[in-house]
Every structure is written in C-alpha cells, then in structure tokens.
C-alpha cells in the first residue's frame, strides 16, 4: 500500500462507526467513510471537539453542521498551499491521500532532467496534482468539466506561488477533449487521470467508470509522446481492484512503451491506532 504519510497540516486522528475524525490545519472535522466498517472505542477527546460534522441522510446525500468553522481556510503540503471550503457530498476540496502520488510523480519529473515535460491532468478537480506537477517544473494542462472546480484550482495555484506557471486551464468533458487533442496531433509526456465512479459532462454526457475506463485509457495512450515519463490512473471504485488497473494499463501503455506497471491501494495513517485507512487505489506506469 502507498501511504500518504508526509502531511503536517492534516491527519486522520481516528475512525469508527462509518466515520473518520480528521484534523485539517487547526480544525476538527467528522465525515462519513464507507470503508470504516468497524466500531472501535472513541477515546480521543477530539470526538467531542468538532468544528464540522457531515451528517448522512437516509435518502442519500446529507448536510454539514458547523461549530466555529470558517467558510474557507488553507493548509500546506510541503511547498504547496490549498484552499479548503466544505461543500456538498461531504467534500472539502482536497483528497489528502493523493499526496502519495504527488510525491511519486514529482520525483520522476525532477529526476528526468528535462525542462520541456508536458503533463495532462484529466478529471483534475481542484488541482492538487496540477499544482504538484507545476511545482516540480513541468507544464501542465488541467481539464475538468466543472467551471467551479477549475476556478478553485486556479486559486490553489495562486496560493501555491504558481500564478505564472505554465498551466493551461480547460473546462471541458475529458473524453471529448482527449479526442480533439488526438485530432490536433498534440502529445504529452505524462498523463494523470482521476475519474469519478459516476459523473456527467457539461452537456449531460454520462460517465460510468466500469464501462468507460478501459476505452478511455486506450484513447489517452494515443496522446503519449515518443519518450513518456509516467501514466497514472486513480480509482475510488471498490470494483476496480489494483490488479484490474495493472491489467488495463499493461495492455495499453506497457505493451507500447515497455517500462513497468505497479498498482496498489492508497491509504492514510490513523494516528490513534497506528493502522492505515484505505482510500482507493492507483495504477502507475513509468518508463
């Protein structure tokens, strides 16, 4: 398992009864987590010192309850700064476990010694990976179907000192954007994708990951340059086991470029227990 253990401003303090107790900077949040199937004693005093609690609804969704929590605040990861704003579907605007991937590809970019690395970040959300890529010295194209998410990602770039970095911001359906890039003959040295389990594009395009992910990996592999550095696929869908990611990336990327594919779970350390909370999986190819 790849563990995002480099955080200072974030931690999973404890988890029990379908919820995880987290510290985001100086604020304590309690959010539902479908992986937390256990019921363990809640001994940490922070269980009773919440600044925000997302309550699930029996009808689906839910709502936030706030206790002296600002509408927006920031946390840092290494030399990156992220703007947090709790919003619908329990989210804060950041997936801290992805830091395990940021560290991995940042090292690859820096060690390549290349000054002209071009990276494509698809389903790019609020730009955690985009900022990490840019900070590592590469040019990045950030694509997300949500205008609001792209605006938020720009704010994160500015906060991280990347206002003048070579970042191209695109609001578009990711599949259609990739198809157009293929027609234009554009190439990238690395591709990152973080597809949702289910989603809709700006014109109502429906995305179901089990149906779409393999053809999409196939499509994206056509955008790789002659000397690609890495290819990363993230998954939060329990049906997409690491071995499934390895198989798909191997048939489409490794078959063409050689290199190595490794897939595994991604997790966050739990401070009170010393155990690890699983947070999905990732498949990684590198030359």
What do the predicted segments below correspond to?
Residues 211-227:
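A short glycine-rich, Lys/Arg-flanked "PGG" loop and its adjoining helix->strand segment in the class I
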Residues 96-114:
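Conserved alpha-helix/loop element of class I SAM-dependent methyltransferases that forms part
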Residues 6-22, 29-96, 103:
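Non-catalytic substrate-recognition/targeting regions of SAM-dependent transferases
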Residues 146-192:
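S-adenosyl-L-methionine
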Residues 115-125:
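Conserved class I S-adenosyl-L-methionine
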Residues 139-144:
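Conserved SAM-binding motif I beta-strand of class I
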Residues 228-287:
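C-terminal catalytic and target-recognition region of SAM-dependent MTase-like enzymes
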């Amino acid at each position: 398992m790849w563990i995002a253990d480099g955080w200072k401003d974030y931690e999973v303090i404890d988890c029990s009864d379908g919820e995880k107790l987290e510290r985001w900077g100086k604020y304590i949040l309690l959010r539902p987590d479908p992986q937390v199937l256990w019921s363990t004693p809640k001994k940490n005093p922070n269980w009773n010192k919440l600044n925000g609690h997302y309550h699930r609804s029996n009808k689906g969704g839910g709502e936030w309850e706030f206790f002296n929590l600002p509408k927006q605040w920031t946390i840092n990861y290494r030399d990156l700064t992220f703007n947090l704003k709790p919003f619908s579907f329990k989210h804060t605007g950041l997936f801290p476990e992805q830091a395990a991937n940021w560290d991995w590809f940042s090292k690859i970019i820096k060690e390549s010694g290349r000054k002209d690395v071009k990276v494509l970040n698809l389903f790019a959300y609020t730009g955690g990976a985009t900022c990490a890529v840019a900070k590592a010295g590469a040019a990045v194209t950030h694509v997300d179907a949500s205008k609001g998410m792209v605006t938020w990602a720009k704010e994160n770039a500015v906060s991280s000192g990347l206002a003048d970095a070579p970042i191209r911001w695109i609001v578009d359906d990711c599949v259609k954007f990739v198809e157009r890039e293929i027609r234009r003959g554009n190439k990238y040295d690395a591709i990152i994708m973080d597809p949702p389990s289910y989603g809709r594009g700006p014109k109502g395009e429906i995305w179901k990951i089990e149906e779409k992910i393999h053809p999409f990996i196939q499509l994206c592999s056509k955008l790789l340059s002659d000397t690609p550095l890495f290819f990363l696929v993230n998954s939060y869908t329990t049906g997409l086991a690491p071995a499934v990611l390895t198989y798909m990336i191997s048939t489409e990327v490794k078959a063409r470029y050689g290199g190595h594919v490794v897939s595994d779970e991604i997790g966050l350390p739990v401070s009170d227990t010393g155990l690890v909370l699983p947070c999905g999986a990732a498949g990684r190819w590198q030359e």
